């Protein structure tokens, strides 16, 4: 019997838009992204699904602390400061083929509080192969804000559009 997503909760989560001194946004290619050949055959002009760091909020954890923790766990970045927090929580639903298979199989999607952080360290600080955390990304790069949406995991694009619109005025070279 198929799962009924309307009976499932959203997972509390934080998302992080990390920008560097040049105002570029950090994005990582998801481990397990579709391979390049499959994407080319589908007509896509990208080499996998990319996204910004994000992750679950631990029990009794403050979302700001969760954002800094997730950034460090997934990217190795430690030299970053919070510039802004989203004005609201954004939600997305998982596509039917992932429902019951990801997020512990018990969530319909995620409810996310987003944070804009400025990375002031050097790129050598970035390490996507963590020792104490599952690897989320197999590649990373800094991208212009206007290029980010085209490469985002499709079911997250609506949230990304809204987050980018909210943070755009603050994404300036520093």
Q: What is the predicted function of each stretch?
A:
Residues 21, 120, 165:
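Residue-level marker of positions within ordered structural domains that often coincide
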Residues 24, 67, 71, 80, ...:
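Generic alpha-helical hydrophobic packing signal
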């Amino acid at each position: 019997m198929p799962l009924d997503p309307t009976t499932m909760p959203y997972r509390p989560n934080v998302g992080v838009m990390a920008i560097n001194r040049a105002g570029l946004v950090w994005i990582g290619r998801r481990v397990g992204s579709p391979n390049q050949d499959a994407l080319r055959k589908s007509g896509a002009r990208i080499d996998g699904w990319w996204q910004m760091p994000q992750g679950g909020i631990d029990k009794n954890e403050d979302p700001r602390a969760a954002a800094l923790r997730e950034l460090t766990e997934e990217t190795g970045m430690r030299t970053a400061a919070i510039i802004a927090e989203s004005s609201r929580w954004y939600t997305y639903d998982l596509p039917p083929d992932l429902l019951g298979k990801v997020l512990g199989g018990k969530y319909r999607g995620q409810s996310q509080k987003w944070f804009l952080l400025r990375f002031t360290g050097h790129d050598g600080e970035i390490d996507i192969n963590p020792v104490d955390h599952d690897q989320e990304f197999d590649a990373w790069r800094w991208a212009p804000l206007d290029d980010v949406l085209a490469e985002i995991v499709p079911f997250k694009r609506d949230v990304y559009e809204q987050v980018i619109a909210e943070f755009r005025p603050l994404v300036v070279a520093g």
